[in-house]
Swiss-Prot record:
Organism whose genome encodes this protein: Aeromonas salmonicida (strain A449)
Phylogenetic classification of the source organism: Bacteria, Pseudomonadati, Pseudomonadota, Gammaproteobacteria, Aeromonadales
A Pfam entry, by short name: MTS
SUPFAM superfamilies: S-adenosyl-L-methionine-dependent methyltransferases
Main location: cytoplasm
Protein name: Ribosomal RNA large subunit methyltransferase G
Keywords: Cytoplasm, Methyltransferase, rRNA processing, S-adenosyl-L-methionine, Transferase
Family: Belongs to the methyltransferase superfamily. RlmG family.
Example GO molecular function: nucleic acid binding
Subcellular location: Cytoplasm
Role of this protein: Specifically methylates the guanine in position 1835 (m2G1835) of 23S rRNA.
Taxonomy, superkingdom: Bacteria
Enzyme class: transferase
One cellular component (GO) term of this entry: cytoplasm
Length: 377
């Protein structure tokens, strides 16, 4: 496992989060290195706030630590990673400011550094927010995998900020340089996206970075068709996304209490919006938590846990998140408590559940998905 980022301009020890002893993935990529090298060779001259957006595990925050950056992220895990890696490198975590991707940005930043993901909706929302605060003196530089930077990506920078150009590729990464223009007319914000949930009369609200933003994903649809109701008073919707599973439970069972948990600030905000707009009378029975799986959730906090596990972290394919979700569920559930999961058939969740719970029952399956139930003995 490579943990030392050693360049001509910095030497940092960096870990992914949560730290794993045999993690084959490193906590930075070529885009981070490209940004660090470029920023080091052209020092910041303008006074004003420094904003970092979408810093995966804190490499950019550590490098720009002397400038007390404002670190903007939709990911709770990225925030925890940033703080852990600052401490690892003996850098004061209080010198930076963490804020979620829906919070207001500081005015007139001197520098904006953006890690570009392959999800353009998040980028569009962030550029729209930047449009309201940048000035012609603001330096805007972004980076990402070359394969994720398209003409449509550059068009977003042009639309919301100003003239844009790209760099040559380096280690399969590419830079974007943008020159913000003077204050321009306000543009309509297309987020959150709103669409009807078929057969319910409900309207689903999705912020920009929520999975399956414009329609119900097929895994969630399959779980909705087989949703367990009654017999559980306290339910956790783990990895809740827009909260559609917990929302359906609140609608069907007037006694159930649902806790919506996700590591995405936008997901939890979307879940809250959906309860507020569709079932306002159920709000006293709903709780909302941004968290890394079930960290610090008390034993017995739920009788049943529903889970549609992700199999990626940022842009890396990994099964450790699903494994942590299952392990945390086993810890939190009381004897007789149930974990219900939906997943792609090829992901072998059946054997993972058997290792933890010593049982796993197929509730329903189709050509692509399987719903499994495991009971805490």
């Amino acid at each position: 496992m490579q943990t030392l980022l050693d360049t001509a301009h910095c030497r940092l020890t960096l870990y992914r989060y949560p730290r794993q002893s045999q993690d084959p993935l490193q906590a930075w990529d070529a885009a981070d290195e490209y940004l660090i090298n470029t920023l080091a060779e052209t020092p910041l001259e303008q006074a004003g706030p420094v904003i970092i957006m979408n810093d995966g595990f804190g490499a950019l925050a550590a490098f720009l630590h002397p400038h007390a950056p404002v670190c903007v992220s939709d990911s709770y895990i990225s925030e925890r990673a940033t703080l852990a890696n600052l401490a690892e490198n003996e850098l004061d975590p209080h010198a930076i400011r963490l804020q979620d991707a829906l919070a207001p940005l500081p005015l007139a930043p001197a520098l904006v550094v953006i890690k570009v993901s392959k999800y353009q909706a998040l980028l569009e929302q962030q550029l729209l927010a930047l449009r309201a605060v940048v000035t012609p003196a603001t330096r805007v530089i972004a980076a990402g995998k070359a394969k994720d930077i398209h003409s449509s990506t550059l068009a977003l920078f042009e639309k919301y900020l100003g003239p844009t150009r790209t760099s040559l590729a380096w280690k399969k990464a590419r830079l974007i340089h943008c020159e913000p223009q003077a204050m321009q007319p306000e543009l309509a914000n297309p987020y959150p996206t709103v669409w009807p949930l078929e057969g319910t009369g409900m309207l689903i609200h999705n912020h920009a970075n929520v999975f399956s933003r414009t329609s119900l994903d097929i895994g969630a649809r399959f779980m909705l068709d087989n949703l367990p109701v009654h017999s559980a008073r306290k339910v956790i919707d783990l990895g809740c996304g827009n909260g559609v599973l917990g929302l359906a439970l609140l609608a069907k069972d007037p006694e159930v209490e649902v806790t919506f948990i996700d590591e995405s600030h936008m997901a939890v905000a979307s879940a809250r919006l959906n309860v507020e707009h569709n079932l306002p009378d159920a709000l006293p029975r709903a709780r909302f938590m941004v968290n890394n799986c079930l960290d610090d959730v008390a034993v017995g906090a739920a009788d049943r846990i529903l889970c549609n596990p992700p199999f990626h972290q940022l842009q890396a394919i990994t099964d450790h998140i699903a494994w942590q979700m299952f392990s945390d569920a086993h810890r939190v559930l009381p004897q007789g408590g149930e974990l219900w999961i939906v997943g792609n058939r090829h992901l072998d969740y059946h054997n993972k559940l058997k290792r933890l719970f010593a049982n796993a029952q197929v509730v329903a399956s189709n050509s692509k998905f399987v719903i499994l139930k495991a009971i805490k003995r």
